[in-house]
Amino acid sequence: MRTKVVLVFGMVALAAATAAHAITADELIAKNAAARGGADKIAAIKSLKLEGKLRFIGGFGSIDVGYAQYQKAPDSVRSEGTVQGLTQVQAWDGKEAWQISPFQGRKDPERMSADDAKALADDASISGALIDYKAKGSKIEYLGTEDIDGTQAHKLKVSLKSGNTEYIYLDPDHFLEIRTVAQRMVRGTESESTADFGDYEQVNGVYFPFSVATHSKDGGGDTQLTIEKAQANEPLDDAMFAFPVSKSAK
């Protein structure tokens, strides 16, 4: 009798373990692509312009900044933050990254460090880290589920071509991203930031998060991004992503 009980419990445990590991990383990625609108619709978006408000939250209180982000396939990105007539710019054209930092008293464009350039390049793709990850030089592992604010989210480890690592959490019912944890090297020290996604809305048939809350583990402060307007496949000049060339240099 004892042998039968042990056998039954063993079979139950085996069934539970099999169910927990039945899904693969590639299956989850396919479900995520379908949930967002489908791989074809995602690939059809060649440019994306997002506008909204970015709130910085810290010991100083909070400050709202006008925000705009431009992305162009395959991997160009430019973000702008504007307040009191001054605009902070960060851009990546697929080869090099640069910035304009008027709030630090630097109004001329300057090239970004290698670590900062990698971080910007990691987020440049319109389709995100999961879609066509092999073509992007990444590796992905499925790590099971993890509790995210009461939700048993699917956890994927993304080893990026840059050497940085991201952990992406997918909602178990809708398979959309609800959180990412990015681990990156900054001047020889590992930096970790968390982004929580919500308020998904369609742009040209593809779902994008219109609310992104970020938290930096190293005490860099929190941000809340709210997208108010989105446009896809509008013409974007390559020059807006490239390092500006002064008139005297032409």
Q: Where are the regions a protein language model picked out?
A:
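Bacterial N-terminal signal peptides that target proteins for export
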Residues: M1-F9
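Acidic/charged, solvent-exposed loop-and-adjacent secondary-structure segments enriched in E/D, K/R, S/T
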Residues: W98-S127
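Sec/Tat signal peptide C-region and signal peptidase I cleavage site
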Residues: T18-A22
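Bacterial N-terminal signal peptides
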Residues: V8-A17
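Gly/Pro-enriched, hydrophobic low-complexity segments
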Residues: L86, D149-P244
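Short, solvent-exposed mixed-charge patches
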Residues: A249-K250
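Short, conserved active-site entrance elements at the starts or edges of catalytic domains
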Residues: A119-K157, L176-R179
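N-terminal mature ectodomain segment of secretory-pathway/periplasmic proteins
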Residues: D26-G105, G137-G144
